[in-house]
């Protein structure tokens, strides 16, 4: 696939490729001598992918094993793990193929490599879209469980959750196919960036509102126990820290990649933007890191899931 940056990563359809409606190219010497390019070794990509692969396989296995975890909330977490699993599998497959090609162990025609490139691009794009969707679904699920606790089980039913999950997967696959097919059109990049901003805004609004409700609840308990200040401050700090971790990890891991896409549209020839384009592999590595962190934030904090995970590990040995 055409790409202006290094073809090292197979998400080449989005790697610094100026849209067809912007007939611009970025010459290598336009980036200037002061550019900082962070090189990501193949071994590091492979290691990150394998760690993420193991983590998310364990999450899926634990949720599948324990019937107590067969609820809408854990199904959303399981689907998030499956999305991250796609990122990991795509990365491991891509890196392994490239290492074999570079070593001369694997010899194949360019057309075959091109087809493999297309398949991996679709997998990665599908996993990114579905990951963002399931992160939003988890936020909505938690919001309903807090603000509509008495009606939660009538609102978030298993059939409804399955329909939402199916719709997300179908939409993710269709979106990825369209994105890869029409990758050189401005509207595709703008839609992807707009989708990221919408998910970020949704999560921020919901989690901030949940934090405000939690602090209000803590103040009520404090007044009853006549220890208003210590409880409220401690709970508020803990809630703020949790919120910072949730939104901070989301923004730090996904933000640079979507900034990259935005700059492709806004300034494809500017030297400063060219410096950012040169770090495309770093942005993909951050997304893989997000696939590693997601189980720690959303899955492994559950005592029931951790207990099941121990049973899964004991059975595997």
Swiss-Prot record:
Name the glycosylated positions: 29
Source organism (scientific name): Capra hircus
Q: How does it assemble?
A: Interacts with MGRN1, but does not undergo MGRN1-mediated ubiquitination; this interaction competes with GNAS-binding and thus inhibits agonist-induced cAMP production. Interacts with OPN3; the interaction results in a decrease in MC1R-mediated cAMP signaling and ultimately a decrease in melanin production in melanocytes.
Q: What is this protein called?
A: Melanocyte-stimulating hormone receptor
Q: Note the superkingdom of the native organism.
A: Eukaryota
TM stretches of this protein? 38-63, 73-93, 119-140, 164-183, 192-211, 241-266, 280-300
Q: Which residues lie on this side of the membrane: Extracellular?
A: 1-37, 94-118, 184-191, 267-279
Task: Please explain the role this protein plays, according to its UniProt record.
Answer: Receptor for MSH (alpha, beta and gamma) and ACTH. The activity of this receptor is mediated by G proteins which activate adenylate cyclase. Mediates melanogenesis, the production of eumelanin (black/brown) and phaeomelanin (red/yellow), via regulation of cAMP signaling in melanocytes.
Please name the CDD domains in this protein's record.
Answer: 7tmA_MC1R (cd15351)
């Amino acid at each position: 696939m055409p790409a202006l940056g290094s073809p090292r990563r197979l998400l080449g359809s989005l790697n610094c490729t100026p849209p067809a409606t912007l007939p611009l190219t970025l010459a290598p010497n336009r980036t200037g001598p002061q550019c900082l390019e962070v090189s990501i070794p193949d071994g590091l990509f492979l290691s990150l992918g394998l760690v993420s692969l193991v983590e998310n396989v364990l999450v899926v296995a634990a949720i599948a094993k324990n019937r107590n975890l067969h609820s809408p909330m854990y199904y959303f977490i399981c689907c998030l793990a499956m999305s991250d699993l796609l990122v990991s599998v795509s990365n491991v497959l891509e890196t392994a193929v490239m290492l074999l090609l570079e070593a001369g162990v694997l010899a194949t025609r360019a057309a075959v490599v091109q087809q493999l490139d297309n398949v991996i691009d679709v997998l990665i794009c599908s996993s990114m879209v579905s990951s963002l969707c399931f992160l939003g679904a988890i936020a909505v699920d938690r919001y309903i469980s807090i603000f509509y606790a008495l009606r939660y089980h009538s609102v978030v039913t298993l059939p409804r959750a399955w329909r939402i999950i199916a719709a997300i997967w179908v939409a993710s696959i269709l979106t990825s196919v369209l994105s890869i097919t029409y990758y050189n059109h401005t509207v595709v990049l703008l839609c992807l960036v707009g989708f990221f901003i919408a998910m970020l805004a949704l999560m921020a609004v919901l989690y901030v509102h949940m934090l405000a409700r939690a602090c209000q609840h803590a103040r009520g308990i404090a007044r009853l126990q006549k220890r208003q200040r210590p409880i409220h401050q401690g709970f508020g700090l803990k809630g703020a820290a949790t919120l910072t971790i949730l939104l901070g990890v989301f923004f730090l891991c996904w933000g640079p990649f979507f900034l990259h896409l935005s700059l492709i549209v806004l300034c494809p020839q500017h030297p400063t933007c060219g410096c950012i384009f040169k770090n495309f592999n770093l942005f993909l590595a951050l997304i893989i890191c997000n696939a590693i962190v997601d189980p720690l934030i959303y899955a492994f904090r559950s005592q029931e899931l951790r207990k099941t995970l121990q049973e899964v590990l004991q059975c595997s040995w």
